[in-house]
């Protein structure tokens, strides 16, 4: 138990796992289900958008999105997410977690539907409308990151807190999987209802007019899970840690948690007064914050930034990589709906076999192995498998070796999710003071989305062939897939090194990790090494 801890917070820390824990996981997790669905489903339909809106009569290949437009469609939601993480992270500390939580969800619901209703007289007009609503969709999604993580960390007990926060994040895997399954069902249904020839046989006829409904339906379905959880989000009480430590209303915090835990909680007035007298109140831009948490914030931001460069590059452009190794046939040999079906099938298999299991391995082991060990291990194996793909890349492009490529590629996803993709979400929700927790998580997550933007825009160009004859229309020559994968391997290695800045929070209360109740004059530098300090001397 942390020094002079409030009874209500201690009650939460030692509470047995019970129904309200799982209720909180589902309520917060469905937001992440929607987040992942909305952010990743666009990669399933970008080739279809190109066929519908950028078809050129007589061209040897189907239409594709021009380079700048493709980058915008893929990247604009990330820019919105980054903005939302910073804004709602800050707002969650100012107004409270609960008050802001409903705003983010309604924004996600409204904008998911609006994306599917994108309109315009020209192709560019439709895409511009889509990008506008995807920005605001991302803005709402961004708010869900710091708020969901903070709420779950502040509700959880210290013994299984890591598993609970990771379980919320693991719903992202189901969101990615659901995006693929929905795309499979919708494209298969339309493909059977509206048969079409291949592009090489009949050009424009390979994209039936009804294909315009396919991408809209896929995009709009993302609103349903969020809409279903709105009522329950509004019924959740404010977290006790915000009410007691930030709003300074220990009586209300005790009353709220008495109902949740079904136990009587009474605060000792002397303890409350002592905490209020001895507690710290430094701000985000103070020297005291820099001294206590500066390296922690550097660690959480740098690891998340580097991870997302690689993670989102792989996720958003796996369809292009699979095409280049021949796992998905050339586009001219398929019709539009068949192409959506095959891309969705490939991404669903990857999600089912590696992405989803990786998340839940983290849930199972995070409170046994610890955050640091999982993050270091995951970063190490991501580096190993990425170089194993990149260096003998020509070997993997041969037809007889394609299955091996897919297996190796899947393993990089597995160790991303049984590794830094999960732990970078968990740790910032545990190591900062309550009054700055949501803000610092938002800053860390925004650094991650900055990495995603680098990946989404950079990899799109970098992976283009070095041979001008093999470059996609409208793109400059790049460094090729092989060299792009080598760069991602180097990024993973840097992520492994930056993990050394992240402290271990396994088995400790949030107040113990953040030194919430220690005065600003106390000697912060005398803490013991090991689990109570940095994972390594820095």
Swiss-Prot record:
Q: For bias kind Basic and acidic residues, which ranges apply?
A: 506-517
Q: Which Gene Ontology terms describe the biological processes this protein takes part in?
A: phosphate ion transport; response to symbiotic fungus
Induction of this protein: by what? Accumulates during arbuscular mycorrhiza (AM) formation after inoculation with AM fungi (e.g. Glomus intraradices).
This protein's membrane topology, according to the annotation, is: Multi-pass membrane protein
Q: According to the UniProt record, where is the region Disordered?
A: 506-538
What are the annotated GO cellular component locations? plasma membrane
The record's similarity note reads: Belongs to the major facilitator superfamily. Phosphate:H(+) symporter (TC 2.A.1.9) family.
Q: What is this protein called?
A: Low affinity inorganic phosphate transporter 3
Q: What is the lineage of its organism?
A: Eukaryota, Viridiplantae, Streptophyta, Embryophyta, Tracheophyta
